Amino acid sequence: ASDVYKRQGHGSSLSCSSSGYNSSDVNQLTNTDVHPFFWSVACVNGDFTGVTCFAETWLRATHNETGEPTGAIATLMSTINQSWAPPMEGQDHMNLILTEMSDNSQSRSFGGISMNGCMKMNDTYGSSGNEMTDTWTCFGDPSVMVRTKAPENIEVSYNSSISSSSSFDLFCSLEEALVTLSVDGEILASEIISQG
């Protein structure tokens, strides 16, 4: 499971300056079953030169007793000082995509949502947006699929026996659902439902 963190405010390479939340606080996290993804509009939270920066700390955090991961699955943080309006535009568009309110983008990966937000920022602010895109760095796995609600059971129908052919029909009540065929825990194929 994941939560989304969106932050705007002053930053440093080791902290969210305006709140005082810093790398030491991240290293004290105890959650081992919920790992957030994080978009930050703040100066230098991703400045990784010469120090383990705030963004890296989020990815490396582990429980002090068990050693299990407690940090983020991915972050988008700036390596330089950020301006205000362009990255706010980018983050606003990331939120629209994440909550499926954007008419122009259907990205589901952290990197896809992040880059689509950057492109909207670039379209709106030109070279000022481009500068922010150049220095907003994705830490973690950009291909991780993110969502705003837990997966649900869906109604699916298919033949009870499947031949060894390379395809078979499956019908589902939810358009664009991801379905997976597995045998004894081994994934054989995954596809997206199209036209029921």
Model-predicted regions and their roles:
Residues C16-T30, V51-N64:
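Alpha-helical scaffolding within the catalytic cores
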Residues S194-G196:
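Aromatic sugar-binding surface patches on proteins
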Residues V41-A42, G46-I154:
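Active-site-proximal C-terminal subdomain of hydrolase catalytic domains
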Residues A1-Y5:
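Short, small-residue-biased leader/transition segments that mark boundaries at the very start
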Residues S165-E191:
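Beta-strand-rich binding/interaction modules
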Residues K6-G11, G46, L174-E176:
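Long, His/Glu/Asp-enriched segments that create or flank divalent metal/ion-associated functional microenvironments
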